[in-house]
Amino acid sequence: MQSLKKYRRITVKIGSALLVDRASGLKRDWLDSLADDIAVLAQGGAEILVVSSGAIALGRTILGLGKRALKLEESQAAAAVGQIALAGAWSDALGRGALKSGQILLTLGDTEERRRYLNARATISTLLKMKAVPVINENDTVATSEIRYGDNDRLAARVATMMGADLLVLLSDIDGLYTAPPARDPKAKFIPVVDRITPDIEAMAGAAASELSRGGMRTKLDAGKIATAAGTAMIITSGTRLSPLMAIERGERATFFRPSANPVKGYKTWIAGQLEPAGRLTVDAGAVGALASGKSLLPAGVKLVSGNFSRGDTVAILSPDGREIARGLVAYDAADAVRIAGLKTAEIETVLGYEARSAMIHRDDLVVSHAGGDISGG
């Protein structure tokens, strides 16, 4: 396993079940041990960002809401109570190692809308320059099912790539990736290293999540695809033991995901990491080949348009068999895209009634994903 001390900027994600016990509340001893690990890495020159789940779980414990399913407004109220307690706990724990901390609450638009993405990145960068540890969570007090990340694994990957982290560590209640969910298959084999997240690797993930958290192995692999495509390595390991980061240093079990050899950079990192494409364009075999060779997507190659998107939105591009092969910023809104799908460039102006762009998605706004999980700028 790779030593954490070789990395200069590390994003660490903590699952709810690690931080919160339903009976006793916050696991302070565990949190203190993790904060001590962070202090060791910081003293070695690393910059650490924390993505911390647990606000709703902690809030429902404080409020005595029990195990029943919560209504949306109850979850948001629990998050409000839990978040203030969680922020204080992080401040106290990190302060033991003379580390300052700052709370960042994000909603989906803060990473998916370009201007807000740049603003969030600037704020977090300033915290790091000031030697403060950013403690980041989704703003569950205002997020709804339609406008939320849904899990902090993908949020952590989005933060890691936004901030140019060279390592993402997902601490969970499972110690890595297996050939099948170990709870279902006692013969499942542990996988120490993943070179690329292929469809075969994705098939190994079960959909089940912990009782207190929303994520499962599938969301962790989704996070891995986002992170590794941008050149960020990833580790999945158990956080149930004390001092979980130093446990990695000691060689405890963990799965290491290698970063892409051809990572997406800069502007295209934002496009590639979009979590919720506004629509989908299904293309023909000829367009698949053109995209793979670095060309723009022309209307002639588009066979099906789905979704209600506007010009400039991110859309997913699907192959004839339904696999996602690229993402890009579309040059037309959905209504016009439907009208010109399948048309040659010379026919577009006649149909739309105005001089329009020749490409549905220009190559400069396009990120092509290749088999095996690598992504290139096209």
From Swiss-Prot:
It is found in: Cytoplasm. Pfam families: AA_kinase, PUA. Residues 278-355 form the PUA domain. Substrate binds at S53, D140, N152. It comes from the Bacteria. The keyword Magnesium does not apply. Keywords: Amino-acid biosynthesis, ATP-binding, Cytoplasm, Kinase, Nucleotide-binding, Proline biosynthesis, Transferase. One of its GO terms (biological process) is L-proline biosynthetic process. It catalyses: L-glutamate + ATP = L-glutamyl 5-phosphate + ADP. Catalyzes the transfer of a phosphate group to glutamate to form L-glutamate 5-phosphate. This is Glutamate 5-kinase 1.
